From Swiss-Prot:
Major localisation: nucleus
One cellular component term from this protein's GO annotations in UniProt: nucleus
Family matches, as InterPro entries: C-myb_C, Homeodomain-like_sf, Myb_dom, MYB_TF, SANT/Myb
Gene name per UniProt: mybl2
Single GO term (MF): DNA-binding transcription factor activity, RNA polymerase II-specific
Protein name: Myb-related protein B
Ranges for domain HTH myb-type: 26-77, 78-133, 134-184
Keyword Membrane: no
């Protein structure tokens, strides 16, 4: 295909298609596709003004230039323009004009062809009429070149066509779009390698082998007749790599499918083969290409020094065994010591050559060792076409017994000599999953203690055990504690008791002989108070009401004799009362929580009432005290304002009798005033309430408080009757009678 001249490009510019939408660089007019209305208008204007007035025609068309109007008319709308297929007469005319004007004057050629442009004539010549253009079917070699070039160049068909002499860019493009592209996308296209490149690769491989001092011996073709028949399921190296000589004979001798099949077998054969399992060869190019750095040095693969298989299948072994047959080959073996001596010696001396070892167990040189190991993974290569390198039996014997291992950048002894803490612990205290051994003394439930004795000393019987750390687990008592134990004896733990505070108070009383008032200081922190019972809350509110709010308290007046008789025991009795009260107030089962008053009488008739703040004197206790004093003397009549009672049995002996006594008084709406003729009298006096010291006798209760406290009100009496009725029904059959006590 000839090159196009500058004149052809200028000629094509005159007939350029303007249907594209690319804007013009000089003007702002946009190239838009021509519409049918514009085509009709252009035809009318050309018919009116002629083909020379393109400026006037363009002025009548919106957004159209003179060049656009001319190109549209000459290429599309001209009535004499022929767009159909080329006739035989036209082809002959083009061939004749090309011989006359050449391939660079397409404008002159187009003028002599009615209805054809220069571009049409040029394309017709280069694509069809040129005798250099190949019209035969595409070959596999051309397909391979097109595929490889398209991967690099893309859709630059002119440059791809230069690689294929006789093929035009248009033909290459059409062939790619119609055939090759579909095969590549579906994966059915196999890249076929050129035979010339394969031969060149084989020659370069053989030259590299010679540079590395590798000795390759070729066997004559006649020896192939002695090769035993191989199994059908084993791939033979002779089928994988056919020599060029054999391939040329088959191509020249055979015709049709025979030559094509032979070529396909040779061209599609892969370059690298790996030995897998025992007798199978598989392609290993994927493995090597994935990690080329690790596979670059094949000399790092070891198959074992004692393996005789590698010696039998190696090229060195073939050289030794075939030496008598190949008489024209002379081998020389240079030793490393000989080379070192040559460097030290003078020039012109003879080179000592060591004889070839005749024994089959001779050690080949290091260069041949590397070549032997490399030959295991690569297919054998031959120099001339009429020889086969190895037989099937030798190929089978080349199979290694173990898988090749890459060279490691570290030493395995690093892992063998390294022991972690977990490994040492597992060795010293193994899990009991089998029959226990005598040397193992640890139990499963016993906590693990690290034994610092080496493992060698544990298993040895004649080595004295290391008792250096034997005493670490024994607890040592400090010297001051030892002296204290010798002097006072061992400590005895006290039994836990819920009344530890009361026990300490009793110890203090017994040892000191005095009674102390222990007042607990309130803590600054907010303490959680236990919920009080309803009875305790009622009693506390009534007591505070009597002390703080009642405007008319009554005072208790006692004769001097009685007061003098009671003074000596006031302090001691009050201390005991305070101690008992402080202890009882903290107990859940105290006297106040039981709902009745505990009376503790003494020699001086001191009465204590359970309360949390004040000590109040009950009228019932005073009456009881008066009755006890009357027992020592004669019976004195007990006078009231309403009458005189001389019988001592009328004195209330309990709260129940006092309740009955006050009930009769309340019924008559008169509060009695108790008078005594002998010892003392009790009178309600209207005086101001005085704050007495805690050591003085507290003030007596008022009449209103006593009425409510002893259940003298109407609602309380009603509740008492109902309660007694219920109790009588409930405990009707019980032998013991219980009294209801209301406080």
């Amino acid at each position: 295909m000839s090159r196009r001249s500058r004149g052809d490009d200028l000629e094509d510019l005159q007939y350029q298609d303007t249907d594209s939408d690319v804007p013009e660089p000089k003007e702002n007019r946009v190239k838009v596709k021509w519409t049918p209305e514009e085509d009709e208008t252009l035809k009318a204007l050309v018919k009116k003004h002629g083909q020379g007035e393109w400026k006037t025609i363009a002025s009548n068309l919106n957004n159209r230039t003179e060049q656009q109007c001319q190109h549209r008319w000459l290429r599309v709308l001209h009535p004499d323009l022929v767009k159909g297929p080329w006739t035989k007469e036209e082809d002959e005319k083009v061939i004749e004009l090309v011989k006359k004007y050449g391939t660079k004057h397409w404008t002159l050629i187009a003028k002599q062809l009615r209805g054809r442009m220069g571009k049409q004539c040029r394309e017709r010549w280069h694509n069809h009429l040129n005798p250099e253009v190949k019209k035969s079917s595409w070959t596999e070699e051309e397909d391979r070149i097109i595929c490889q070039a398209h991967k690099v160049l893309g859709n630059r068909w002119a440059e791809i066509a230069k690689l294929l002499p006789g093929r035009t860019d248009n033909a290459v493009k059409n062939h790619w779009n119609s055939t090759i592209k579909r095969k590549v996308e579906t994966g059915g296209f196999l890249t076929v390698k050129a035979s010339g490149q394969q031969e060149e690769r084989e020659d370069s491989g053989y030259q590299a082998a010679e540079d590395q001092n590798h000795v390759l011996l070729s066997e004559p073709v006649e020896r192939s007749a002695n090769i035993p028949e191989e199994p059908s399921n084993i791939l033979s190296p002779k089928l994988l790599t056919k020599s060029p000589g054999i391939r040329s004979e088959q191509e020249s001798g055979g015709e049709g499918s025979n030559s094509e099949s032979a070529t396909a077998i040779v061209d599609s054969a892969p370059e690298k083969w790996m030995v897998e399992y025992v007798n199978f060869l598989v392609p290993g190019s994927d493995i090597m290409e994935s990690d080329p750095e690790a596979w670059c040095e094949l000399s790092s693969f070891d198959l074992g020094e004692d393996s005789t298989v590698s010696d039998v299948g190696s090229p060195t072994h073939a050289a030794v065994t075939d030496k008598p047959q190949a008489s024209n080959v002379t081998e020389y073996r240079l030793d490393g010591h000989t080379l070192s001596d040559l460097c030290k010696g003078n020039k012109g001396e003879l080179i000592p050559i060591s004889p070839q070892p005749q024994t089959a167990f001779g050690t080949p040189p290091s260069v041949l060792k590397q070549h032997k190991k490399r030959k295991i993974t690569l297919s054998p290569v031959t120099e001339n076409g009429g020889s086969i390198t190895t037989s099937v039996t030798e190929a089978n014997s080349m199979t290694p017994k173990s898988t090749p291992v890459k060279s490691l950048p570290f030493s395995p002894s690093q892992f063998l000599n390294f022991w972690s803490k977990q490994d040492a612990l597992e060795l010293e205290n193994p899990s009991l999953t089998s029959t226990p051994v005598c040397s193992q003394k640890t139990m499963v439930t016993t906590p693990l203690h690290r034994d610092k004795t080496p493992l060698l000393q544990k298993n040895s019987v004649f080595i004295t055990p290391n008792n250096k750390f034997a005493a670490d687990h024994v607890l040592h008592t400090p010297t001051p504690f030892k002296n204290a134990l010798e002097k006072f004896g061992s400590l005895k733990p006290l039994p836990p008791t819920p009344h530890l505070e009361e026990d300490l108070k009793e110890v203090l009383r017994s040892e000191s002989g005095i009674e102390l008032i222990i007042v607990d200081e309130p803590k600054l922190e907010r303490q959680k108070r236990k919920p009080h019972s309803p009875m305790k809350k009622v009693r506390k509110s009534l007591a505070l009401d009597i002390i703080d709010k009642h405007p008319k308290p009554s005072s208790l007046t006692l004769p001097s004799a009685v007061s003098a008789h009671m003074q000596p025991q006031t302090c001691d009795s009050f201390l005991s009362v305070s101690l008992n009260e402080s202890s009882c107030s903290r107990e859940e089962n105290s006297v106040l929580n039981q709902g009745f008053v505990q009376v503790k009488t003494s020699k001086g008739a001191v009465v204590q009432l359970g309360n949390t703040s004040q000590l109040l004197t009950d009228i019932g206790e005073l009456v009881k005290t008066q009755c006890s004093l009357r027992n020592t003397e004669t019976a004195t009549p007990f006078k009231t304002e309403n009458g005189t009672f001389t019988n001592t049995d009328l004195c209330p002996q309990s709260l129940m009798d006092l309740d009955t006594f006050h009930s009769t008084a309340v019924a008559s709406n008169k509060c009695p005033t108790i008078k005594t003729e002998t010892l003392f009298q009790v009178k309600p006096e209207k005086t101001k309430m005085q704050r007495h010291n805690i050591m003085n006798i507290p003030e007596p209760m008022t009449a209103a408080w006593k009425t409510v406290a002893f259940g003298g009100s109407q609602d309380q009496m009603l509740m008492q009757e109902k309660a007694r009725a219920i109790l009588n029904l409930t405990y009707k059959h019980s032998s013991t009678s219980r009294a209801l006590v209301l406080s």
